[in-house]
Regions:
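Active-site-proximal, substrate-binding regions of enzyme catalytic domains
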Residues: 3-236, 246-365, 378, 382, ...
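Nucleic-acid nuclease catalytic cores
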Residues: 239
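Short beta-strand/turn micro-motifs composed of small residues
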Residues: 242
Length: 406
């Protein structure tokens, strides 16, 4: 049966290891993998490039990936820098809450005890904010600017030099692909049918170097270029790395939660039939780093693997930002991990906060929950129509240590 339905079978661990080490393998990277490099901590980027250097002769980029990367690079840099400005703006609003909202309540005259507790809370939160701003500035300084030298691009250029595919041969070739794409998308044939909505956007098309591109067919163009490359006689194994988690690349199954089984069977079947390769496999950046660490024995940090996974998750939200509305979503993947590098360390007492090398994510989660609960309780109590003191917390309620899990 396997000879007829090879696309439904996953490779064994030994086959995957052979592909990493075989000289007839190509490693192909999607645009989103390169874009996400701008959202990583410095150590994660270092680890990524360390793995790439180990397989450098096997790395290849489709022309479509190179084009999309060059067109989007500055926008991604701009968006990443904007995150730091928005963080600073949001933190600045905290002082305004105390200066405006609380001052208008005349607490010193009406509730002296509560006024003193409010001042202490303001002082504690100000220390948290001040130290957090220091860590934010550290990472902001590490990010490239739109007009500065882009070291990330320089490293990519060095690794893929001479290993980028040719541009589409003609507009006729593209137009024929678009016609095929309409049929494929109508029948949910991967890849790219989940991008069909891009055809309705204002920037649904763009032109470059004498050719007009339809954005919704970007994945299909990439895929066709990858297959053409795989047809070369000296290529037997193809590994594709993408942070696109949609069902038009991956076969997923809802079994006690959504689970990714592997590359879509249609994709594997198509490349086996069209290119005659023996092996096709796909990774996300995080699983690529994990396999590189295991198979090539590269010193990839666990924190880099974790961060690549989280950045992939947040890159698919409506806004690119790593702003977290539900902080548990970002904490959960890091349970029992330690980050290496400057981070804000939150101790049980909010007055003792420092920038250090190691961070226990559980401590951060606990401290945020504690401060949020205190602040929300105060605001709700103060704004009640009944301003009686019996509804307000005692002094000790604001100063006690949070020894256990909140």
């Amino acid at each position: 049966m396997k000879d007829k339905f090879k696309g439904f079978y996953s490779p064994t661990d030994s086959q995957i290891e052979d592909a990493w080490k075989d000289g007839s393998t190509i490693f192909v990277f999607d645009t989103n993998v390169l874009m996400n490099l701008y959202g990583y901590a410095e150590q994660t980027r270092k680890d990524f490039f360390e793995v790439l250097k180990k397989i450098e002769p096997k790395v290849w980029l489709p022309y479509q990936v190179g084009l999309e990367y060059q067109r989007r690079r500055l926008d991604v840099i701009k968006d990443e820098k904007a995150i730091f400005r928005k963080i600073d703006d949001s933190l600045s609003k905290i002082d305004k809450i105390f200066e405006n909202d609380f001052n208008q309540l005349a607490l010193a005259r009406r509730f002296p005890k509560l006024s003193e507790n409010t001042k202490e809370l303001h002082k504690d939160i100000s220390k948290l904010v001040s130290n957090y701003k220091r860590s934010v500035k550290y990472w902001d300084d590490k990010q490239p600017c739109v007009r500065s030298h882009d070291e990330i691009r320089s490293q990519i250029d060095e690794i893929v030099s001479g290993r980028i595919g040719d541009k589409p041969e003609s507009q006729q070739w593209l137009d024929k692909l678009y016609q095929e794409g309409e049929i494929r998308y109508k029948n949910n044939i991967p890849p790219g049918f989940k991008d069909n909505g891009k055809g309705n956007a204002k920037d649904s098309t763009f032109s470059f170097d004498g050719l007009t591109y339809e954005r919704k067919f970007g994945d299909l163009i990439l895929w066709k270029q990858l297959i053409d490359k795989a047809k070369e006689s000296d290529i037997k194994y193809v590994v594709f790395v993408t942070d696109d988690a949609k069902d038009d690349w991956w076969y997923t199954l809802d079994s006690r939660g959504k689970k990714t089984i592997g590359p879509h069977a249609n994709l594997k079947t198509e490349i086996y039939q069209e290119a005659g390769v023996e092996f096709f496999h796909m990774y996300s950046t995080s699983t690529f780093l994990e396999s590189g660490k295991k198979i090539l024995e590269v010193g990839v940090h666990d924190s880099s693997i974790d961060e690549a996974s989280v950045v992939q998750f947040y890159s698919h939200l409506p806004t690119r930002a790593h702003f977290v509305r539900n902080q548990e979503q970002v904490v959960r993947p890091f349970r029992r991990r330690k980050y290496v590098g400057p981070r804000v360390v939150y101790k049980a007492n909010p007055s003792t906060v420092e920038v250090g090398d190691d961070v226990d994510i559980d401590d951060i989660a606990k401290e945020f929950r504690k401060q949020k609960a205190i602040f929300q309780y105060m605001m709700e109590s103060i704004r009640k129509k009944d301003k009686s003191a019996k509804d307000l917390p005692e002094d000790d309620d604001f100063n006690e240590e949070d020894e256990g899990e909140s």
